[in-house]
């Protein structure tokens, strides 16, 4: 049975719409609190972090109210990268962690990402159980007055997160001599990002660090890489780091101003880990990973598997196959040895490990030639139109025409009202012809 509230990465939508409003966030809090209370712990604890959206100020109190009404004690952490929340959920031995964010989306959207006590995103099975609790009568979940939860603010969350990141580094690790540009997307990483790099001795040029509630991801961050590209050239930096709104994605830029996507970052890290005998099993990508990446790994005898789109599915396939590296072209990259979910700053440190020894970013990222890829995102009112027989037939025809020379992938977004149509081939004319066949049926 399809889920009612949860998508591919938590719950997301327009603020004050059907699911993203104070009333629903109270219900989400009450339902998740009720579910996690079943764990046999002496103290029932939930921790909440958020990005910098204006709507966070109205949604967070509603969520807290629901959790405390279920008898959960709550720590609010303020703006913090998503993986910072995942790490602190585990280190604080909390029952759960909840991130209020809509990731790379504009300010007018918001949502929730939920983590269990192990720092992992919730499984489909648990999400369905929570959905059942959301829809039941409220009286069944309310705690008695003397069993209501309490709320505390944790002011040290960003420092605690940075400390955990640095604990993974050698004691003598430093970035002295490196000039680094970081774009924090006016989002959750605006404090931790620059502070981490400066504490390691780098000369840091920070942009996207002045959030006003409305400018998160606006012409900045990982979905707008031109900003970091221009900044790297302006400041003559060795490398550029571009995060998204909740800092779980990273796109980079080398010293020449060339933008490096998630596939290229994964390839470079995989090769370094293989040389150091750190790579375990192989690498997990997604349906959207470039075909050139697949060919590159085959050439270097590295096993490569594809999962559905979404870093949760990447992590699940990594766990199932005992791999320790995986990620998405969009910049969600999971370093399984150190983290349970994507973390832009953690990935940046892994890359900077090589640069601090004098290697140029352009050399580090010189791995594979990408197969030309065209991606179209079409806004639609109903994502189910993808099941239309005419659209299905157009996809079959396009796949037949391009077979052996590339691939066509058509999928609905799990977080937005969009249909994504992607094609890859070295034969550009054929690729454009095949995409046109599909697009004219959808549009």
Swiss-Prot record:
Annotated EC: 5.4.2.10
Cross-referenced PROSITE patterns: PGM_PMM
Keywords: Isomerase, Magnesium, Metal-binding, Phosphoprotein
An example Gene Ontology CC term for this record: cytosol
Catalytic reaction list: alpha-D-glucosamine 1-phosphate = D-glucosamine 6-phosphate
Catalytic residues in the record: 103
SUPFAM superfamilies, A to Z: Phosphoglucomutase, C-terminal domain, Phosphoglucomutase, first 3 domains
Role this protein plays: Catalyzes the conversion of glucosamine-6-phosphate to glucosamine-1-phosphate.
Family indicated by similarity: Belongs to the phosphohexose mutase family.
Protein's UniProt name: Phosphoglucosamine mutase
Organism: Pelagibacter ubique (strain HTCC1062)
Encoding gene, per UniProt annotation: glmM
């Amino acid at each position: 049975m399809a889920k009612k509230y949860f998508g591919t990465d938590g719950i997301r939508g327009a603020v004050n719409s059907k699911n993203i409003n104070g009333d629903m966030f109270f219900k989400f809090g009450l339902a998740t609190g009720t579910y996690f209370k079943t764990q046999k712990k002496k103290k029932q604890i939930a921790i909440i972090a958020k990005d910098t959206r204006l709507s966070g100020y109205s949604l967070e109190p509603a969520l807290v109210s629901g959790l405390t009404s279920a008898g959960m004690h709550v720590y609010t952490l303020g703006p913090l990268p998503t993986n910072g929340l995942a790490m602190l959920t585990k280190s604080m031995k909390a029952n759960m962690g909840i991130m209020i964010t809509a990731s790379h989306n504009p300010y007018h959207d918001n949502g929730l990402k939920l983590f269990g006590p192990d720092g992992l995103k919730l499984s489909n099975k648990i999400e369905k159980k929570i959905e059942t609790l959301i829809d039941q009568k409220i009286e069944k979940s309310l705690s008695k007055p003397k069993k209501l939860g309490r709320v505390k603010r944790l002011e040290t969350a960003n420092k605690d997160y940075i400390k955990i990141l640095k604990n993974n580094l050698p004691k003598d690790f430093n970035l002295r001599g490196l000039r680094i540009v970081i774009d924090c997307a006016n989002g959750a990483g605006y404090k931790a990002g620059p502070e981490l790099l400066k504490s390691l001795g780098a000369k840091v040029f920070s942009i996207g660090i002045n959030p006003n509630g409305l400018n998160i991801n606006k012409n900045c961050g990982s979905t707008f890489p031109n900003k970091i590209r221009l900044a790297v050239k302006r400041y003559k930096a060795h490398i550029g780091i571009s995060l998204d709104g909740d800092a779980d994605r990273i796109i980079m830029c080398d010293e020449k101003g060339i933008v490096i996507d998630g596939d290229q970052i994964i390839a470079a890290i995989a090769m370094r880990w293989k040389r150091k005998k750190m790579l375990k099993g192989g690498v997990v990508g997604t349906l959207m990973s470039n075909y050139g990446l697949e060919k590159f790994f085959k050439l270097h005898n590295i096993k490569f598997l594809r999962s559905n789109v979404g870093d949760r599915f990447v992590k699940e396939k990594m766990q199932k196959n005992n791999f320790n590296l995986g990620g998405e072209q969009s910049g969600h990259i999971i370093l399984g040895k150190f983290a349970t979910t994507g973390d832009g700053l953690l990935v940046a440190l892994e890359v900077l490990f090589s640069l601090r020894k004098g290697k140029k970013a352009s050399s580090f990222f010189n791995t594979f030639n990408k197969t030309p890829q065209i991606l179209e995102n079409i806004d639609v009112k109903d994502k189910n139109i993808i099941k239309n027989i005419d659209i299905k037939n157009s996809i079959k025809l396009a796949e037949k025409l391009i077979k052996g020379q590339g691939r066509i992938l058509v999928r609905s977004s799990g977080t937005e009202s969009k249909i994504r149509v992607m094609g890859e081939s070295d034969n550009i004319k054929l690729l454009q012809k095949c995409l046109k066949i599909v697009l004219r049926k959808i549009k």
